[in-house]
Structures are given as C-alpha cells and as structure tokens.
Amino acid sequence: MPSLKEVRNRIASVNSTQQITKAMKMVSAAKLRRAQDRAMKIRPYAEKLNGILQNIAASLEDGADNVYAEERELKRLLIVVVTSDRGLAGAFNANIVKAANALIEEKYSNLYQANKVDFICIGKKGAEAITKRGESANLEYQGLFQNLSFDTARGASEYVMNAYLTGKYDRVEVIYNEFKNVATQIIRTEQFLPIKGQALSAVKHSATEVDYIFEPSKEEIVKELIPKSLKVQFYKYLLESNASEHGARMTAMDKATENAKEMLKALKLTYNRSRQAAITKEILEIVGGAEALNN
C-alpha cells in the first residue's frame, strides 16, 4: 500500500490537472459558440451560391470553356489535410490522418507509390503526422485558425486553385471535419477540383432551372462566379473544421474532468484506508508496548 505522502501528492496532482481540464473545457465552450455560429451561417450562403452557379452553368452551351471543370488525365494529385494547430481534442486529428491514409490506399495507391501525391497541411498536427511518416508537406499553414476569416483563408484557396490551373495538379481532394454537434464530427473527403459535373448535369435536366436575366453575359458571370464560389467553399471547409475542433476539445476536456473526479474519489478512498491502517498499526504498537511493560 502506498504511503500517505505519496497518496497526498497524487491527489494534489490530479486535483491540479482537473482544474486545468475544467478551465480548458470552459474556454472551448466559449470559442465553440462563436465558431458554430459562423459555420451555421455560411452553410446556406454557400449552398445558395452553388445553386445559382449550377443553374447558370447548366444553361451554358455544351462545350463552353470552364477551366475549373476540365477533366484531365490524373498524373499528379494534391491532398489538402485540414487539422488543428493544438492537440487535446480527442481523436479529432487522428481521424483525419486515418482518412487520408484510407483515401490513398483505396483510390491512389499507385500514384502514391510513384511519388505523385503531394500534401498541403492546414494545421500543425497534420504536418506533424506526415513528418512521422518520413515525408514532408509541400506547404503548411499554421496559425490560420487563430484569426480565421475569408481574407486569411484566401491565400490557401488561391494557391490551390492556381496550382490546378497551371497544371501542377490534375485533381485536388480536401479532407476535413464537418461539424454536426458538440459530440459528433463527421469526416468528409471531397473533390475540390475539378468541379464535378454530376451536379451540373442534374440541374441541366431538371425542371427547376431558373430563368435568369444576365448582364453582361452568362459566360462572363460564370467566369467571375466560379472562382468566388470555390473560395467560399474552401472557407466553409475551414469554418466547419474550426467548429469541430472546439467541439471535440470541449468533449475531451469534459471527459478528462469527469475521469479526474473519479480518480480523486479512488485516491481519497486509498488515502483514508492507508491512514486507517497507519492508525491501527500505531494502536497495536502502543497496546503491544503496554502489555510488554506489564509483563
């Protein structure tokens, strides 16, 4: 049985840890409210923008030039991995890394073995995971979530779009956490570029196509709207991931606080038993000493 001093030290240590996890839970809860609000607000905006884009693009003549929807032979792939800069968020980052590994194994193993797969890591933890594999990310964005805005996210989205336009990459996949609720985050793997044609085809053959009046022309509007829509979509990925991170950290810290509470109960019980055993031992020694004197 451990000594009373050892148990007291462990109780003090666990109590200190509990205070830290409780404080982190409260901080994450405060940040989550703002991050969740921003993620919820951009969803209808992004969906409406994409709906307008699809209706306009579907009404264009077949064969109209759309560089962002151009399907090319897949010679080089870019995977954008969206993680966090900090840990203590449960399996938030580990699940993203697992999803990236699964994506490569299931769809792009030949490209990967031929060293034709590059990574962009948004968040420190993604870059660390790739480094552990003996590789390095082609580009890292750290600290982006400290002051996340459309302007701060624009640099990353424009780099990805330009890399696709110049032919450096033939396809871009994005892996991120979509926010569902505080306790649930859904791993999403989406093809960012080229723009998938299924949605446009569905709109083209649907009866809900909207009859827009264009000024100056459809082609010019689409030319301007597609890049903006892509930037909004990329920004949405980051907002979803940011809200998911705070939700995951809040849940993890809540669980850690509860675990610390249970551990404190067990340690206090151990302390009381050790103290009782020590007192019993002292009483027995006193009684034994008194009997020895009487004899």
UniProtKB/Swiss-Prot annotation:
Transmembrane segments: none annotated. It is a peripheral membrane protein. Keywords: ATP synthesis, Cell inner membrane, Cell membrane, CF(1), Hydrogen ion transport, Ion transport, Membrane, Transport. GO terms for molecular function: ATP binding; proton-transporting ATP synthase activity, rotational mechanism. InterPro entries: ATP_synth_F1_ATPase_gsu, ATP_synth_F1_gsu, ATP_synth_F1_gsu_CS. Gene3D superfamilies: 3.40.1380.10, ATP synthase, gamma subunit, helix hairpin domain (1.10.287.80). Disulfide bonds: none annotated. It comes from the Bacteria. Pfam families: ATP-synt (PF00231). GO terms for cellular component: plasma membrane; proton-transporting ATP synthase complex. It is found in: Cell inner membrane. GO terms for biological process: proton motive force-driven plasma membrane ATP synthesis. The keyword Transport applies. CDD domains: F1-ATPase_gamma. HAMAP family: ATP_synth_gamma_bact (MF_00815). Belongs to the ATPase gamma chain family. F-type ATPases have 2 components, CF(1) - the catalytic core - and CF(0) - the membrane proton channel. CF(1) has five subunits: alpha(3), beta(3), gamma(1), delta(1), epsilon(1). CF(0) has three main subunits: a, b and c. Produces ATP from ADP in the presence of a proton gradient across the membrane. The gamma chain is believed to be important in regulating ATPase activity and the flow of protons through the CF(0) complex. This is ATP synthase gamma chain. The gene is atpG.
